[in-house]
């Protein structure tokens, strides 16, 4: 396994997963240049992890641990989502999306509560802010057969939250379970059952995770049962009644 202190090897264009997104991406902490946004995000995780402070244990990370390792080992969070424009970290993808929309719309971080913050101000890691101009990116987009370029194929600065471990993609059942868990965490947080101070405490997150897992397992069992019986309305997994959340937490 590569040491966390080893220099980040720069890949050739042919080795990049998306060579069409090659451009100039600058690290705001050390001014090192990268040809791909994913390489810059990985560099930040490996070389500047000590810029993070965990809001759950109020401890600054050291350079020997990444934010993902810290959340997994110290707080039992198997997956977290880090914003590429400020390196704030959130417990669910939905929270990251809400935070990103606020940054893009108003320049403010919004009301979504992160589980870890960095020394970087919200939006300060956006390449147009660092470089003073939008990053130069070679699109290299391919024209679909018999049609024009799709608007959805436009290129923007990547905000990556994927782990670069090379793990196999999750199964359909695992992906569904993850969605149910994320929705449960979101519902618990949005229910305002806990105060802001409580959310920064480890014991609170242990309760949140246990409750979210229980809710996710219950919903998944119900969905499986309904598929087998092939009757009755489908269970709505996107919203979880608040009364069930309170029952699980209490």
Curated annotation (Swiss-Prot):
Residues 148-165 have a biased composition (Low complexity). One of its GO terms (molecular function) is DNA-binding transcription factor activity, RNA polymerase II-specific. PROSITE patterns: ZINC_FINGER_C2H2_1, ZINC_FINGER_C2H2_2. Residues 126-177, 226-250 are annotated as: Disordered. Changing residue 148 to L: In ot108; defects in left/right asymmetry in the gustatory ASE neurons. Significantly reduced expression of LIM homeobox protein lim-6. This is Zinc finger protein lsy-27. A zinc finger (C2H2-type) spans 25-48, 52-75, 81-104. Residues 239-250 have a biased composition (Basic and acidic residues). Keywords: Metal-binding, Repeat, Zinc, Zinc-finger. GO terms for cellular component: nucleus. GO terms for biological process: neuron differentiation; regulation of DNA-templated transcription; regulation of transcription by RNA polymerase II. The keyword Nucleotide-binding does not apply. It comes from the Eukaryota. Involved in regulating left/right asymmetric differentiation of the gustatory ASE neurons. Plays a role in modulating expression of LIM/homeobox protein lim-6. The keyword Nucleotide-binding does not apply.
